A protein has these predicted regions:
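Conserved mixed alpha/beta catalytic, RNA-binding, or beta-rich assembly cores of soluble enzyme
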Residues: 25, 32, 37-201, 205
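Short Cys/His-rich zinc-binding micro-motifs
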Residues: 16-17
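Iron-sulfur cluster-binding cysteine motifs and their immediate structural context
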Residues: 1-13, 22-39
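Extended, intrinsically disordered, low-complexity segments
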Residues: 185-234
Length: 234
C-alpha cells in the first residue's frame, strides 16, 4: 500500500487511504471492498475558497464530461485565481484509442476555456504505480508520445508510473513539459511522515525531517532540472 493504510492484522485505515485501488485485486480472499467518498460541488467550492491553492488537479474518465463540467463550474464559483487546472486522464482500463482519448481531452479543454482556466494535461500512463518497479515508467512515456500530436493546447506532463527510470526512456530530442511523481515520491518520504507522526507532529513542522524529506525529493527532481537546462524547451 503506497499510503501505508493497511497494517498487519488490521483493516484499511480510511484516514490514510486515498483510493488507488491497488489492494483490491491483490487480496486473494476478496476481503477488501470499496465505497465512495464524495464532496458535493458546493463543498468543493467552499474548500477551494478556504485553501486558496495555486493549482487544482481533476481526475476524469471517458464519458464523464458532464461531471467534469460540474466540477469546473464549482471551482469557478470559488473565485480563486488558479494558475493551472491539471486534468489527469489515461488509457488504462478504458479500452480507448489515443485518438478517442484526445477527443475526450478536447471536450475538457472547451470546458476549461469557457471558465478562463489554463489547462495542464497530466497523461496517466499507469496510475499510481511508480513505486512498483522500473517497468511502470514505460506506460507514461509511451502515452506522451502517442498523445503529443493529438492533444489540445497546454503543457503535456508525464504521470502514472513515473519513477527514477522515466528520464532514461526519453530520447535526446524528447522534452515533456513536466513530470509528476506520485506513488514513487510517497514511497520515498513515507518513512519520514510516519516518524514525524510518532513524534506527535507533522513532517513540515519537524525541521530535521523536513530537510531530509527535501533532500530525498530533490534526488528525484534534480536529473530533470539538469536535463531541462540544456534545452530551449524550458
Amino acid at each position: 500500500c503506497p499510503a501505508d493504510a493497511i497494517a498487519f492484522n488490521t483493516a484499511v485505515d480510511a484516514r490514510r487511504c486515498y483510493g488507488c485501488g491497488r489492494c483490491l485485486p491483490a487480496c486473494p480472499h476478496g476481503y477488501i471492498s470499496e465505497r465512495d467518498h464524495r464532496l458535493d460541488n458546493v463543498a468543493i467550492a467552499t474548500l477551494i475558497a478556504e485553501v486558496r491553492p495555486d493549482a487544482v488537479e481533476v481526475h476524469t474518465a471517458p464519458g464523464r464530461s458532464e461531471a467534469f463540467d460540474a466540477v469546473i463550474a464549482a471551482l469557478a464559483v470559488s473565485r480563486v485565481p488558479l494558475q493551472r487546472l491539471a486534468v489527469s486522464c489515461g488509457l488504462e482500463g478504458h479500452a480507448l484509442t489515443p485518438q478517442a482519448l484526445s477527443c475526450e481531452l478536447w471536450s475538457r479543454y472547451n470546458s476549461l476555456r469557457r471558465h478562463g482556466l489554463r489547462p495542464l494535461w497530466q497523461l496517466d500512463g499507469r496510475p499510481m504505480s511508480g513505486d512498483v518497479g522500473a517497468g511502470t515508467a514505460r506506460a507514461a512515456v509511451q502515452l506522451w508520445r502517442r498523445l503529443s500530436p493529438l492533444a489540445p493546447p497546454g503543457p503535456l506532463q508525464l504521470a502514472g508510473g513515473t519513477n527514477g527510470h522515466t528520464i532514461d526512456l526519453l530520447g535526446v530530442d524528447e522534452y515533456p513539459a513536466g513530470v509528476a511523481f506520485g506513488g514513487m515520491a510517497r514511497r520515498v518520504v513515507m518513512p519520514l511522515i510516519l516518524e514525524a507522526q510518532a513524534r506527535g507532529t507533522a513532517l513540515r513542522h519537524w525541521p530535521e525531517g523536513w530537510r531530509r524529506g527535501l533532500a530525498l525529493a530533490e534526488a528525484l527532481v534534480r536529473p530533470w532540472q539538469a536535463r531541462c537546462l540544456t534545452t530551449d524547451f524550458c
